[in-house]
Amino acid sequence: MSLRAVPGYFAAYPSEGFQGLDSTKYDHLELINHKNWKELYHAIPRNTKNRHYKLLILARHGQGYHNAAILRYGMEKWDAYWSLLSGDEHGEWLDSKLTPLGKDQVRRTGSNVLLPMAKQLGMLPHVFFSSPMRRCLETFIESWTPVLAETQELPAGTKISTRIIEGLRETLGSHTCDKRVAHSMAVDEYQDFSTESGHTVHWQYVPDYPEDDELWLPDHRETCAEMDKRTLNGLFELFNQLSSEEKFISLTCHSGVIQSVLRNLQHPPIYNLDTGKVVAVVVEVPVNTADRGRL
């Protein structure tokens, strides 16, 4: 058995054989068979001896300085020249942070998508995960702050733990925007971050998390097949951490990761997913995932 998406919940995957949709033309997050998130959640299949079911929320980071540069220079010049540099006069994009527009995008997503979702479900995700890249750390903070501010069960000062998965990063190699800064630099800037809602975000890293980026190479851009293998290992790492009761899961990541996750889950493609947008998938997880090991 392998991981797979379950159809029939969202417009992005209404039925088997669906060929995908353009998210700029259609609402990929539309609930197609349920009135609200609570009804949808209760319609997710019950766990069995061999299979568990999860509601996985995949959030793309907001606009980073590298995204702004692509719009400014065009993809051809970006790939050929600018992506190999660390920035320009408008900003630095090595392990890019969010632009002001990017922060606005994910705040709107928090208020318009995540908050109604959490209110209808009557809960926050059971477990939060994130890519280690700075644009994702900032996206998590900015997008979930409006939700935390409305969550009365979590008084100010509550610590929100978010687990970092190193393997669920954007396409590796060559482009400096996808090179991670030193771990100590990210920790100094973001660890135990105090949100505007008065909560504290604590990032959970694996023991012996590497100080320097050991995955990114300057002279090799990861292929689609290589990325899919890495992403699948990252998904195994994620699901192996969950109990059977932890069903509502959040992952803050990248467009490339989301597309790779969808391929690994045999989910139809979602084209042109904009920065700051969210994809939701019901996932069937083999109970023996932990026994599969790494690929």
UniProtKB/Swiss-Prot annotation:
Gene responsible for this protein: PMU1
Assigned keywords, A-Z: Cytoplasm, Isomerase, Nucleus
GO molecular function ontology, one term from the record: isomerase activity
Cellular component terms (Gene Ontology): cytoplasm; nucleus; peroxisome
Annotated function: Probable phosphomutase that may have a function related to the manipulation of phosphate groups on carbohydrates. Reduces trehalose-6-phosphate levels when overexpressed in TPS2-deleted cells. Reduces 5'-Phosphoribosyl-4-carboxamide-5-aminoimidazole (AICAR) levels, a metabolic intermediate at the crossroads between AMP and histidine biosynthesis pathways, when overexpressed in a ADE3-ADE16-ADE17 triple deletant.
EC number of this enzyme: 5.4.-.-
Name of this protein: Probable phosphoglycerate mutase PMU1
Subcellular location: Cytoplasm; Nucleus
